[in-house]
Amino acid sequence: MYGFRPNRGCHDAIKELYKRLNNTKICYIVDADIKGFFDHMKHEWIIRFLKLYIKDPNIIGLVKKYLKVGVMEGEELKVNEEGLAQGNIISPVLANIYMHNVLTLWYKFIITKECKGDNFLIVYADDFVAGFQYKWEAENYYKLLKERMEKFGLQLEESKSRLLQSGAYIA
């Protein structure tokens, strides 16, 4: 998982993608982006995910308070019912935890078990690329991905998400 971490920036993600494309039999790529990711993360899921890693109820309580802090729009206070305010120190951490639980673990323990060929997942914030050796695996993943995102209150940005052919192994 790349983004918002030391030595895990966008250039590192690109290098990893290059390495995977050149050292595997990947032929199909799912290139995806989540629509308004920071605005649509569900608070209830954020807390549930945090509780998997943090046992101190005081820390969980502080995060709950942070999630409900509003944003001033002009002279009006807008209270957050979902999503995270961007540009502060904790939002990227919470976003990475959300993506780790929604996407990365699901990919690792569910998707890869169904794959017969080479595959990979590279995640950078709310953008990600999954590679597959076989077309049917990529198509199945793309279909299941949409369902997975909906379960957690998210949607793919259709204009930025697609299935591509790639690689030297395309017949």
Model-found features: residue ranges?
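Conserved polymerase palm-domain catalytic core
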Residues: 1-167, 171
